[in-house]
Amino acid sequence: RNMIELIGTNAGLVWNALNEGGKMSVKAVKKATKIKAEKDMYAAFGWLAKEGKLAFENVEGELYVALV
């Protein structure tokens, strides 16, 4: 599979996890999606953020993400 496909697939996993779980920490998203590489997860965040679908919040040094 090419990289763009992988990012798109992972973006779908992230969207589904956040749709079910609401606002989650990055650690919780990683666990829920089973995306192994952190870079792949952040690429998926970028995909969704570019589409205007994610909000980010820094809470006491920990990054949280949610669907908008």
PLM regions with names:
Residues 23-33:
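Short acidic, hydrophobic short linear motifs in intrinsically disordered regions
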Residues 18-21:
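Short helix-capping/hinge SLiMs at alpha-helix to coil transitions
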Residues 4-11, 56-68:
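Short, cationic-aromatic polyanion-contact patches
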Residues 4, 34-35:
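A generic secondary-structure micro-motif detector
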Residues 14:
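Localized chelating/binding microdomains
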Residues 35-47:
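Short amphipathic alpha-helical interaction segments
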Residues 52:
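Glycine-centered, phosphate/nucleic-acid-interacting loop/turn motifs that mediate DNA/RNA or nucleotide
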